[in-house]
Amino acid sequence: MMSLSNKSLNQHLPGMAILVMLSCLALFALPATAEPTTRFEHIYTPRGTAHLTIANVNGTIHVSAWDKRTILVRANTAPAVEITEREVGDDILIAVKRSFRVGRADFEINIPADTYLTLKNLMGDIDVQNVTGPISIDSIDSNVRLIGLNSPTVDVKVTSGDILFDGNLHDNGSYSMLAVKGDLDITVPESTPFNLHARTLSGTINLGSFISNLVSGSREPKNISGSYLKGGPQLSLTAYAGRILLHKK
């Protein structure tokens, strides 16, 4: 007959084995998850309206407006990443230096709303919120989200990735968005007139209820142009291999 102590030990063996296995897994996992990072942080104080340029290689760029007149740029980077900065008057250029080892740099940026913004990236999503200044974005592989904008000009070019725009259109403004491979999802106010040119090669164009008030110069399935509510700012949408979706707000 099994003794009480042996029986008790056998009852606890499965639980003890699980604890040992979990401890071993945790030890093996530590080197993989404990990759060191470095921190970049700088505050800029432009005298007038700033022009901020961010040139990244691999990583996200998040920009949001705040009510201060300073610019705060923060980034978490891999140790091998080198960030350079140049400030000439109100022109500020922050760039990730390219090297054979492509390290990651994730930017978090706060700017005055009227800052002129230029963003360049090879790989990594881009997010801009509540900005009122001109915006230029050029990326190879990024999903771009532009939310709450009130900018006079927007120019976005993406080789691979989706573009989402939700904002206002200014009188005499220019809004150009191009994705070689990706969708364009655009939301603009129903009451704002504009001139539209939408084209795609292998995708589809869906203008929703805008189509009923569009005085069209072209109604081809892959190429639609015309004036909405007598026309106004220029809205140019191009998706070579993707959909174009236009929504009212």
Feature annotation, model-predicted:
Residues M1-K249:
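Intrinsically disordered, low-complexity terminal regions
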